[in-house]
A protein has these predicted regions:
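Short glycine-rich loop/turn motifs that provide flexible caps or phosphate-binding loops at active sites
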Residues: 4, 22, 37, 82, ...
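C-terminal "cap" of GNAT-fold acetyltransferases
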Residues: 57-60, 64-71, 77, 87-110
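Conserved glycine-rich acetyl-CoA-binding loop
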Residues: 18, 27, 31-45, 54, ...
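Acetyl-CoA-dependent GNAT
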Residues: 1-33, 44-46, 50, 87, ...
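Conserved phosphate-binding and hydrolysis motifs of nucleotide-dependent enzymes
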Residues: 1, 5, 38-40, 78
Length: 110
């Protein structure tokens, strides 16, 4: 088989009380040949289910401003942009901004 996509969900240590309710998406990737088929959204939904099953209430993630498709996927899945870092990456001599998102996945935070 060939890997079509992946999502890496990171859970904080339970000893970190201040963020013990929040999981983060570290990597979310869909191969170019597999895009446009809903896989990115299905991976997100699976990650949210896993986080809920482990009693997490929120998921956070970050994305480069140049990743337009990913931004559309996150926003259509209910993620809210809460911040921008003007210099998130430097590629060559170009400064690229980064966006920060969150989604509450339980009623506990509403």
């Amino acid at each position: 088989g060939v890997v079509a996509g992946s999502l890496q969900l990171v859970f904080p240590l339970k000893s970190n009380e201040s963020s013990s309710f929040s999981a983060s998406i570290d990597t979310h990737f869909v191969a170019p040949w597999a895009r446009g088929k809903g896989l990115a959204k299905r991976l997100l939904e699976s990650g949210e289910e896993l986080a809920r099953s482990r009693s997490f209430s929120q998921i956070i993630l970050e994305v480069r401003e140049t990743q337009k498709r990913a931004i559309r996927v996150y926003e259509s899945a209910g993620y809210t942009r809460w911040g921008t870092l003007p210099t998130y990456h430097i590629v060559g001599k170009e400064k690229i901004s980064g966006y920060f998102y969150y989604k509450n996945i339980s009623k506990e935070l509403d």
